Design a protein with these regions (language model features):
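Short amphipathic, positively biased membrane-proximal segments
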Residues: 1-135
Length: 135
């Protein structure tokens, strides 16, 4: 099994699990939506659906290029919520706060792995549409 395939399977599993949890147990996700944002439950549902769509795209060969790019955008988009959760973790046990702060730098490999999948799935192709030379 190639490294890229292992990474892809890991991301599919991670995104599927997290996406399902957004619907089965939304309360923890609602609690980490930054206070300034309205419609917290709706945002959680949309982000959960987005994770499931990204997982499905990564799982299917025809969707990997777009799925990788979409996953990178998704991991970038949820980063503020992860920061918010870490900042607001004051009354939690020490190990929990360490885990919340420790996971922030882990967003970087998730984004890079997603981009790697997109790049390798579409080697030499544009993500969307045709190049000017093809038109």
């Amino acid at each position: 099994m190639t490294t890229t395939r292992r990474i892809r399977l890991f991301l599919v599993t991670l995104l599927t699990t997290s996406g399902v949890l957004h619907f089965v147990r939304p309360a923890p996700f609602i609690s980490i939506v930054p206070r300034r944002l309205p419609y917290k439950a709706g945002l959680v549902a949309v982000s959960g659906a987005g994770e499931l769509v990204c997982a499905a795209l990564l799982a299917h060969p025809a969707g990997r290029r777009f799925g990788g790019a979409s996953s990178a955008l998704l991991f970038t988009a949820v980063f503020p919520a992860n920061v918010s959760m870490a900042v607001r973790s004051g009354a939690r046990p020490g190990w929990y706060r360490v885990a919340l702060w420790g996971r922030l730098p882990l967003q970087i490999p998730l984004v890079l792995w997603s981009l790697r999948i997109a790049r390798e799935a579409g080697a030499g192709q544009r993500l969307v549409g045709r190049s000017r030379a093809e038109q």
